[in-house]
Structure formats: C-alpha cells, structure tokens
Amino acid sequence: MPKNLTPILEAIEPVIIGHDCELVDLEYVKEKSQDYLRIYVDKQPNGIDIETIAELSELVGEKLDSMQPDPLPDPYILELSSPGLERPIKKEQDWEKAKGQYIHVGLYQKLEGEKVFEGHLLDLDDQEIKLEIKIKTRRKQLTIPRKQIASARFAIEF
C-alpha cells in the first residue's frame, strides 16, 4: 500500500478541477485481499451527477494508467464517487462550509470523558473549534483544540 498519495493527487486533481469539480478525498485501502483506490468528488452548488462521475472515472483511470513510474504497481480497483451527505471535513474550506452545520467530530484523546461529539459548529480559528452539543435536554458549548481532532465529517441531525 503506498504511503504517499501525493503524486496521484497531483496528477488527477487538474483533471477533476477541469470539469468544475472538487477533489474531496482520496484513499487507498485493502479490504480482504483486494486493494481499492477511492476518489471522492463533488460539484457545487447542487452536487455531482452520475454522468459526470462516469466521465471522470474514465479520465482519471486513463491518467493513472499513463503515469510513469506507476505509483500503484499492484492490481487495484478504482472507485470514484460522491462523498455523500456525511462528507469528510478535511480542508480549511470544508471547515468554513461547516460553520453553522451539524457535524461529527472524533478525537485522538478523551475530552470531558468522551472521544466523539456531534453538534453545531459555532465558530473556529487556527487553534480550536467551538461546538454546541446537546446533553439530554440542555445545550452546552464545547471548545475543542484542532490538534486533538482525529476526524470530522458532516452529520445528519435526528
């Protein structure tokens, strides 16, 4: 499994941007005995359609096949899809879009006895985020240092 996906990212991002789309995430995983290169793309403002995904899948596949040296010499399955409603929050622009939205945050270490929080993102800066969480019937503001955040994504509020 490649440790560095940067050459792949640098090769395919211009193809994706050239179709007015955004590269949301890229991952290379092994499931059972099969390797997968998963590429998540989106298009603003209304999301990406299946025709665009199919076209990008073809173009990205061709781009990857033409790379020398081959960054993925072992056989793999290419999956290109929308990130869905619970898209990851990774880049700074993702965090900005998440302001006021309901999000899921996973931490490296427990904070106030928990490693996972869901709530509305009230504010953020370079150092921390402010999340409004609900504990039973009361609301509480929680400040989380950004360096403690292992993962974040949009969430669906029930």
Swiss-Prot record:
The protein's role, per its UniProt record: Required for maturation of 30S ribosomal subunits.
GO biological process terms held by the UniProt record: ribosomal small subunit assembly; translation
Keyword Transmembrane helix applies: no
Signal sequence coordinates: none
Record GO cellular component, one term: cytosol
Name assigned to this protein: Ribosome maturation factor RimP
S-S bridge residues: none
SUPFAM superfamilies (UniProt xref): YhbC-like, C-terminal domain (SSF74942), YhbC-like, N-terminal domain (SSF75420)
Cellular compartments annotated: Cytoplasm
InterPro entries on file: Ribosome_maturation_RimP (IPR003728), RimP_C (IPR028998), RimP_C_sf (IPR036847), RimP_N (IPR028989), RimP_N_sf (IPR035956)
Alphabetic keyword roster: Cytoplasm, Ribosome biogenesis
Superkingdom of the organism of origin: Bacteria
Stated family: Belongs to the RimP family.
Pfam family, one: RimP_N
Gene that specifies this protein: rimP
